[in-house]
């Protein structure tokens, strides 16, 4: 484990990184399709130069998705969509073992939650991944200066999709979003 990093991050405990890495690798062994995609992305680098801000559950499954995007050339900043589901060891491993900026601590309060979203947005994203539409909402309310950089995003939850559809109906949504919850692959 690397004990120092120049990456911007806010995690609970760097000493948890080794345990987090073990759990991420275990999850990876049960995600063979994602592993194949990562191999292809390592060769083709489809996300070279792309900055992604992701607001998702910080779990071993999400960690493997972030690793795939990084293998594809993306620069990533991940924050927690739900502080109560944050796995602190996973967050530590993403920072110290895999070089991904993470802003997440299990049990963080409301102010910390929104500070983490803003910290992830400081990457000046081209794409966003959201779970509940809080990141996209902040982009469209208090971080509007970043909107010209964002070309697209995806939303994982039904609640987030409802919020996005209302934003689109009101003419407030400034970039296209994929409703992951509506895709056939989510319901296989």
Predicted regions and their residues:
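Glycine-/proline-rich flexible loop or hinge segments
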Residues: 45-51, 70-76
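Histidine-anchored nucleotide/phosphate-binding helix
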Residues: 59-73
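Short, glycine-rich nucleotide/cofactor-binding loops
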Residues: 51-60
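Glycine/serine-rich phosphate-binding loop and adjoining beta1-alpha1 elements at the start
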Residues: 2-47, 78-188
């Amino acid at each position: 484990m690397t004990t120092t990093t120049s990456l911007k991050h806010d995690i609970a405990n760097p000493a948890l990184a080794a345990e987090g890495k073990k759990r991420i690798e275990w999850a990876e062994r049960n995600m063979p399709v994602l592993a194949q995609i990562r191999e292809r992305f390592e060769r083709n680098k489809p996300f070279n130069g792309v900055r992604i801000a992701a607001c998702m559950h910080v779990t071993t499954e999400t960690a493997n998705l972030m690793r795939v995007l990084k293998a594809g050339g993306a620069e990533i900043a991940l924050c927690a969509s739900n502080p109560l589901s944050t796995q602190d060891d996973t967050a530590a491993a993403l920072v110290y073992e895999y070089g991904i900026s993470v802003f997440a601590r299990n049990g963080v309060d409301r102010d910390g939650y929104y500070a983490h979203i803003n910290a992830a947005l400081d990457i000046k994203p081209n794409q966003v991944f959201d779970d509940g539409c809080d990141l996209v909402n902040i982009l469209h309310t208090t971080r509007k200066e970043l909107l010209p950089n964002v070309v697209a995003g995806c939303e994982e939850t039904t609640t987030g999709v409802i919020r996005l559809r209302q934003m689109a109906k009101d003419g407030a949504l400034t970039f296209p979003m994929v409703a992951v919850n509506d895709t056939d692959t989510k319901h296989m």
